[in-house]
Amino acid sequence: MRHLESENGSIFQTALVFVRMNKPTIGRYKMKVSSKAIVNGEFEDKYGKRGNQFSPSGMPSYSIPFEIEDAPEGTKSFAVVLEDKDAISASGFVWTHWLISDLKRTSVAENESISATDFTQGANTWASALGKFEIEEASFYGGMAPPNNRHRYELIVYALDTVLDLPRGFRFNELYFAMQGHVLDSACVVGTYDMCGGVCLI
């Protein structure tokens, strides 16, 4: 794990650390994450814009389930990031759909985002200049809604040797820097979603 020396480090340094933090460790441990929301490589309709559960302002809110297996010894909590790097083609930046910190169990059921009280949720990218949602409404799962074509969504789980104690509504950068030096292992599962019922031309 590489640490940034200062917030004014070069773009290359920042990007390098970002990639390393988000690349699942291979061979060191055997932690795995899986989700029954993914069927034949695609997230089911109900977890995004083709579903039928939304926040008051229209954000898809029916959250995905997932299970973690073989976490390393010494794990005190998990941090979870659901992100869409393909959003760069439409918005110019990675879109974060779900942020979780201080998860102390190895499974989360579907639609738990709206009711769970034993883990902390951060603000997703629906709370941004583009999304324009208030942080409170966006501090839950914000489902998939790719505007241009089929996107790939990565569910990344980090096993940590500490509890982060971040406040509700934390941002990705706060989670990212709080995890520095505490990641024991990571695991990732990928599924796709589109707005054309799986028959997109692209």
Task: Place the predicted regions along the sequence by residue.
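N-terminus-centered regions that define maturation/targeting leaders and the start
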Residues: 22-202
